[in-house]
From Swiss-Prot:
UniProt-listed NCBIfam families: glycerol_kin, PRK00047.1
PROSITE patterns xrefs: FGGY_KINASES_1 (PS00933)
Keywords: ATP-binding, Glycerol metabolism, Kinase, Nucleotide-binding, Transferase
Name the UniProt record assigns to this protein: Glycerol kinase
Catalysed reaction, written as an equation: glycerol + ATP = sn-glycerol 3-phosphate + ADP + H(+)
Originating species: Brachyspira hyodysenteriae (strain ATCC 49526 / WA1)
Length: 494
């Protein structure tokens, strides 16, 4: 009798696997970090073979720690860092180049060329995305143009492309299945999210052969089988990490919004079955493909959130441990007029300025370590407010609450300041591993382990609610200062 679902959670800095039981308890967790590769300024890569090795290793480890037999596993669900691009030889199964990570800016010149040709409007209207180096399409083109022999192999049908989910399914099934789901496809900048097919106009412009691309399916269905300790286990859930978190937060209704505070910060609002094109710098993406229906979401991606705390710790050496952030932030009553704009790799939504760079402004002789640490924390919340304000304007839906998850949502100071600055209650669930939980739910629903979405909604439990306490005058004053600081950071690297 199957009693468990295993979630594979392949992130930007680590590979994880979590075994969940029917009652959503985390029976075991295994995690392993892998190498971050920075060949040049603004370039970020991963070794796809190392991603596979670490991910399969922690999958086996989590099962072993839980003491679970393969026949007790109902299904495997996959959630993954999105946009990160792998191209491999379908005959050898070997990547022809390192995976180009979502954070990598090397393809900014390709994006500039697309804009010069006037393709940005077409791409926005059909993929829901803005033309940016963040997405997969230009990364595929770069690999084909710059790896010797790649273009010839691609034209012969010998190369395959995949986001990380596709790469993992290919490896788990022994090269039998080349597939992705709607949520991951919607992040490539080459997938038409209105017509639900790879977009031939964009493929032609980027010179990407259709033969490289995976089949696109629902986020909850049986894609293939993984061989786990001699038994075949269905792989039956796939969603990009942020869509998976929205699903794990039971964000099934129009207007439901969540913010995941990780390396970056990612806000998604469910907008239902109708496509809305943002007029305020957001992207439209596929929230989920479930039971043959597509739901859309508005998304704002903040490139640097938790990563700003790592920078304060590792580069400025103002912290010994990231866990100390809240302690220092609450030692002072405010930032003493300091703002930190962490535009280390440009600014994401709603600005989309590839050439913005980080800045620290408002420094006087009286500014100390705690002020700068607090400014770093507040920057995470300000960037989220930028996105949420744009969402409300686009959707016409007033936010009733914001559900939160991800590592930094455990920081009570940050959650209270987030509530204060958006003037909306912030809800933190008992289970904050919602990204992995979403993948588990999708996998479990496909095989009947859980019954339906209503059952999942009933399982969502609140741990703590944060309510706004700032006056309108104070809130506006703080936010005006932030907007001024953002202007200082823009267009810096031109």
């Amino acid at each position: 009798m199957a009693k468990y679902v295993v979630a594979i959670d392949q992130g930007t800095t680590s590979s994880r696997a979590i075994v969940f039981d029917y009652d959503q308890n985390m029976v075991s967790v295994a995690q392993k970090e892998f190498t971050q590769i920075y060949p040049h300024e603004g370039w970020v890569e991963h070794n796809a073979a190392e991603i596979w090795a670490t991910q399969f290793g922690v999958l086996q480890e989590a099962i072993q720690i839980a003491g679970v037999k393969p026949e007790e596993i109902a299904a495997i669900g996959i959630t993954n860092q999105r946009e990160t691009t792998v191209v491999w030889d379908k005959n050898t199964g070997e990547p022809i180049y390192n995976a180009i990570v979502w954070q990598c800016r090397r393809t900014a010149p390709i994006c500039d060329e697309l804009k010069k040709k006037g393709l940005d409007t077409y791409i926005r209207e059909n993929t829901g995305l803005v033309v940016d180096a963040y997405f997969s399409g230009t990364k595929i083109k770069w690999i084909l143009d710059n790896v010797p022999g790649a273009r010839e192999k691609a034209n012969k049908g010998e190369l395959l492309f995949g986001t990380i989910d596709t790469w993992l399914v290919w490896k788990l099934t022994g090269g039998k299945v080349h597939v992705t789901d709607y949520t991951n496809a919607s992040r490539t900048m080459i997938y038409n999210i209105k017509e639900l097919k790879w977009d031939e106009t964009i493929l032609k412009e980027l010179d990407i052969p259709m033969s490289m691309l995976p089949e696109v399916k629902d986020s909850s269905c049986i894609y293939g089988y993984a061989h786990i300790n001699g038994k075949e286990v269905p792989i039956s859930g796939i969603a990009g990490d942020q869509q998976s978190a929205l699903f794990g937060q039971a964000g099934f209704n129009k207007g439901d919004t969540k913010n995941t505070y990780g390396t970056g910060s990612f806000i998604l609002m469910n907008i239902g079955e109708n496509f809305i094109l943002s007029k305020n710098g957001l992207i439209t993406t596929i929230a989920i493909g479930y039971n043959g229906k597509i739901e859309y979401a508005l998304e704002g991606s903040v490139f640097i959130a938790g990563a700003v705390i790592q920078w304060v710790r590792d580069e400025l050496r103002l912290l010994h441990d990231a866990k100390d952030t809240e302690y220092f932030a609450t030692k002072v009553k405010d930032t003493n007029g300091v703002y930190l704009v962490p535009a280390f790799v440009g600014l994401g939504a709603p600005y989309w300025d590839m050439y913005a760079r980080g800045c620290l402004v408002g420094i006087t002789r009286g500014v100390n370590r705690s002020h700068i640490i607090r400014a770093a924390e507040e920057a995470i919340a300000y960037q989220s407010k930028d996105v949420i304000d744009a969402m409300v304007a686009d959707s016409g839906v007033k936010l009733s609450s914001l559900k939160v998850d991800g590592g930094a949502c455990r920081d009570n100071f940050l959650m209270q300041f987030q509530s204060d600055i958006i003037n909306t209650k912030v809800l933190r669930p008992q289970i904050t591993e919602t990204t992995a939980l979403g993948a588990a739910y999708l996998a479990g629903l496909a095989v009947g382990f859980w019954k339906d979405k209503d059952e999942i909604t009933n399982r969502w439990k609140l741990e703590r609610e944060f309510t706004p306490s700032l006056s309108e005058e104070e809130r506006n004053k703080k936010y005006m200062g932030w907007k001024k600081a953002v202007e200082r950071s823009r267009g810096w690297a031109l």
